[in-house]
Amino acid sequence: MTKVRKRLFLIALCVITVISSLGLSAYAASPEETVSALRNEPTKLICVSKYGDTAHYPENSIEGIASAVQKGADMVAVRVKATADGELVLMSDDNLSRMCVDSQGNSINKTVSETGIYELHEYFLKSGKGGVSQTATEYKIPTLLEALQAVDGKTVLLIENAWEYKDEIYTLLSDNNRLNSCVLMLEAGKKEISSWLSGKSAMPIVFSKFKGTVVWKSRSYINRTVNAGVAGVLLGSSNAYSMTFNKNTVAKAQGKVRAVIDMTDPNLSGKRADTQLYWDDVTSRGFSVIITDNTEQLSEYSKRTENARARLSELCDVASKTDLTLCSTYSATNLKNRLTVSKDVLSSSVCANALENEYYELSKALNSLNDRSTDDKNQKTVTKGRVVAAVLVAVGFVIVEIIFERYRNESIKLRKVGRKLYGKAKKK
């Protein structure tokens, strides 16, 4: 590569780096962006906060959801229960004792299903994930509608146990024009999901859920629920080596729907920890929606991944537009091959490290471009003339070998004849 070209290439790299770094500041995608990404951007990593910011607020609380969004969550997973008078509230357990106390600080040993909404609103949520050791807070149990109104335009809720209350949830979302504000996780058979969705005039956004280790069952489940119209499939197993996590299994979902994994539950993540090391692992397997307890860290990891993807995409554009006319055949072919690999990486769900490594390899291929006049002296170009010359040389070697072999055989025959004549003369 000439000095001028090298300078232009270095300038292009600097521009790419500066522009990409401008997008590093953490922010949560808008609900519209998240829904669009679910449907149209299969490689974009989506961060789902499990029950909100439980490090600072009660799980399933409006305040915890809002805090998770501020920390970069694209979606927030919640669970719902129905009260005695039919209101849907955010709560993981039917029994209130783990998460609720009365005004005196006493745990409430009652179920949601036997308690009315007005009575529930008198109770207070315990901090974090609740339990005996957690203290009471000032925060209250919200209804699903209150939560939707509070986060309107800020995030998308993923209702984990939606199948249990699917009809009530659908009616509430439909009546309040909120079908695009929630994703319903349907843990049911493929036939049941297909049957339920087929009767809907307006289609909700749906994830299905499969837990198991048998590969043909998981692949069949993916295919059938994809055909039913789901936007994602949560694949889970307690076995780290389950074929459920195999790239070939996840590939059944890629390009059609999102592969979802819950890193907060060892029985669903194959006992993988909710850390960057294992985020690398699952994203390299094709998972692109991750449910996490570490919202801020995963959000930063997601931004790093998208930044690396943007940088590689921009460098691919530079490589595609590079004039190779005066470049050596060897270096030009090397760049073309590397560019093909880079585009394959961009079209797949891969980890941040893979994107960054591929950026380095493509940069190296670009920087290694050499002018034909200087490089072809060392890297011999394969041409028709050279191929013909090589063939003629090979034929020449074969002919020489044949002549030599004939000469050797004739010499052997003459020696044998000479020995016979010598023997006869000696006898006389």
Predicted segment positions?
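Hydrophobic H-region at the start of alpha-helical membrane spans
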Residues: 12, 386-396
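Bacterial N-terminal signal peptides that target proteins for export
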Residues: 1-12
